[in-house]
């Protein structure tokens, strides 16, 4: 076993809630390491929606998923968190009161006073559509998320699906793509009504295509798509130009090893009490989309609130002999010094 990395708090998940938890903990002189299965920070915001606008962050009228991630990273710079990316936590073992030993699939071992699970919905992967040979084009012509809009500029783009992601990217990519074709198995969409109205208006004006049916075959060479075959609900078969494809068939969410850590679960979520969002195991907290409690709303701003209250309770485990005096960043010179603004 490798030598243990010691830290006050280990945060599992480097999405927005995990990142903001670093800030709240840092204000209380609590050091944190973060582990994430993804190869970059930002969680689903950066992985699936990096250029999609977010409108419900308080005081920020609009920010993209990547923009929010970048701003959070800037905000936590004063606390110098350490990131361990591309790793999954495989085991959490209680070794003290408080105290935990955490092991990753890369063989790293951590010892900490507090564990914070901020793993979103757990590990996730997009559902692959049942199209023969689609794997050969994944990562070059077939993408399950939009990370850089510019790569779709001037391309014939086929978007498959009928939910919010499919409609949102149809509307967002329409201005820059050569041509957008939206494919859905029925003429009934699960997306926001306003988005559906906008899409139908574009179709009616001849600015994009809508096909009711399914993609049955792909054509291309060396990973580069050139065409897609569509079989309509009337059994008519049509081949259309396709240089890029975005299938949005939803995500398969897996809680993964969390289910084996001895924490009470409820429908693949972690129940918590609401004064500090502590789990059934003292010293292990769960914040963000992975937790559940009466009245839970899955919003980023709610996860931020949960992180703030979690930090107050975590302080008791990290500094059991030290009384916590609540301070405001607007008036506390000591907090401002930590933030480098005084």
From Swiss-Prot:
Keywords of this entry: FAD, Flavoprotein, NADP, Oxidoreductase
Cofactor(s) required, per the database record: FAD
Gene3D superfamilies according to UniProt: FAD/NAD(P)-binding domain
Binding site for FAD: 17, 36, 44, 49, 89, 124, 289, 330
Range of residues in the leader sequence: none
Positions of transmembrane segments: none
Cofactor: how bound: Binds 1 FAD per subunit.
Disulfide bonds listed in the record: none
Enzyme class: oxidoreductase
Catalytic activity: 2 reduced [2Fe-2S]-[ferredoxin] + NADP(+) + H(+) = 2 oxidized [2Fe-2S]-[ferredoxin] + NADPH
GO MF assignments: ferredoxin-NADP+ reductase activity; flavin adenine dinucleotide binding; NADP binding
InterPro entries on file: FAD/NAD-bd_sf, FAD/NAD-binding_dom, Fd--NADP_Rdtase_type_2, Ferredoxin-NADP_redctase_2
Cross-referenced Pfam families: Pyr_redox_2
EC code: 1.18.1.2
PANTHER family referenced in this protein's UniProt entry, alphabetically: THIOREDOXIN REDUCTASE 1-RELATED-RELATED
UniProt subunit comment: Homodimer.
Family: Belongs to the ferredoxin--NADP reductase type 2 family.
Protein name: Ferredoxin--NADP reductase
């Amino acid at each position: 076993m490798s030598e243990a990395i010691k830290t006050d708090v280990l945060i599992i998940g480097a999405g927005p809630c995990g990142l903001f938890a670093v800030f709240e903990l840092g204000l209380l002189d609590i050091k944190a390491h973060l582990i994430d299965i993804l190869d970059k920070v930002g969680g689903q915001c950066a992985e699936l929606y990096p250029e999609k606008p977010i409108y419900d962050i308080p005081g920020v009228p609009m920010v993209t998923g990547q923009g929010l991630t970048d701003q959070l990273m800037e905000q936590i710079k004063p606390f110098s968190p350490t990131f361990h990316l591309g790793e999954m936590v495989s085991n959490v073992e209680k070794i003290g009161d408080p105290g935990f030993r955490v092991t990753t699939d890369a063989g790293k071992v951590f010892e900490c006073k507090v564990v914070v699970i901020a793993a979103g919905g757990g590990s996730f992967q997009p559902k692959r559509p049942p199209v023969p040979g689609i794997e050969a084009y994944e990562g070059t012509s077939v993408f399950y998320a939009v990370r850089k809009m510019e790569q779709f500029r001037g391309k014939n783009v086929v978007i498959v699906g009928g939910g919010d992601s499919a409609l949102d990217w149809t509307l967002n990519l329409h201005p820059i793509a050569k041509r957008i074709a939206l494919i859905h198995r029925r003429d009934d969409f699960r997306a926001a009504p306003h988005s559906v109205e906008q899409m139908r208006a574009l179709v009616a004006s001849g600015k994009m295509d809508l096909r009711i049916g399914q993609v049955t075959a792909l054509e291309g060479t060396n990973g580069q798509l050139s065409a897609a075959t569509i079989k309509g609900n009337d059994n008519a078969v049509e081949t259309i130009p396709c240089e890029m494809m975005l299938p949005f068939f939803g995500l398969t969410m897996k809680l993964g090893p969390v289910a084996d850590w001895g924490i009470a679960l409820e429908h693949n979520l972690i129940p918590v009490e609401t004064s500090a969002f502590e789990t059934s195991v003292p010293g292990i907290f769960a914040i963000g989309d992975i937790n559940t409690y009466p009245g839970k709303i899955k919003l980023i701003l709610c996860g931020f609130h949960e992180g703030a209250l979690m930090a107050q309770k975590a302080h008791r485990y990290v500094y059991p002999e030290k009384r916590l005096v609540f301070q405001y960043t607007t008036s506390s010179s000591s907090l401002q010094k930590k933030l480098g603004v005084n």
